[in-house]
């Protein structure tokens, strides 16, 4: 039996797709984080929202969505759940009622210290693989920016 890839050289296989390599790596990394985050009662998207807020607190929903590359319709339910858990507050901006501001609570700020296990896990994985994460992060950030530019040119 012949390899189907040899019969269709112009068609890229799944393993040759950049999008699949990134997607499957992301899935594996999410699985690596899951046991640590479940101890905190968090999902990965909730965790990255908190990471952004630990970096810069008291932001608008729009600014947080832009920082996380999430649409408002995805971010709002996530923030409502975090608010229900007591990690943040959502309040209307007194200067513009259309704007919702996000602020960490004391509980949300305290969670940062507990989340260090998840971060240590990733760094341990990189150390075991003898990898310096900095160049990977820089390359992926550059790739993201280029993809966003192409998406804008294509009207996406």
Residue ranges and their predicted role:
Residues 65:
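The alpha-helix within a helix-turn-helix
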Residues 1-10, 113-116, 128-156:
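C-terminal regulatory/oligomerization modules of transcriptional regulators
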Residues 49-50:
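Short alpha-helical "packing" element that flanks the helix-turn-helix/winged-helix DNA-binding module
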